[in-house]
């Protein structure tokens, strides 16, 4: 099942490399504030994310901040639904996905695998997550443990996507913000970090 889900991601962004972060037990961050905050200023690795529907819990302000505009369309699906998992790939989903779209073409997504993921499997998923047209975020903060982050050209010359993914307990959570050509990469990275912080802190709970 994990192979199928990993393949769906690879179809979307190609084949390449990602940064894998496996923080030691001594690492710690500061307490998140109520406002969306860059990941570098918070510690979300100890969150426990449920493997179930969560779109209703996400805050509208955070979604619109990630899109840099209002939501014009949504694309949600649950595990067991037949859904478009990637461009040209429609199949039975084994994940819970929340997708939001703006009129500008910007997209914000968050999804969690329905099946539990072991630490060994998570390390493998983190290493294989990016693709051709991607580059690693060498200074990316941790998002779960282990975690990975990448910037990819989803459609060469037309869109860029920033994706963070990681293991929270036994849940493999991913989040992504993408925008059409013309959006600054640094701004897109900041928006993705804030979006991921919001998803993890809203959906996840402390043990």
Residue ranges and their predicted role:
Residues 1-30:
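Hydrophobic single-pass membrane-targeting/anchoring helices
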Residues 22-207:
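A small/polar (G/S/T-enriched), proline-flanked helix-loop surface module common
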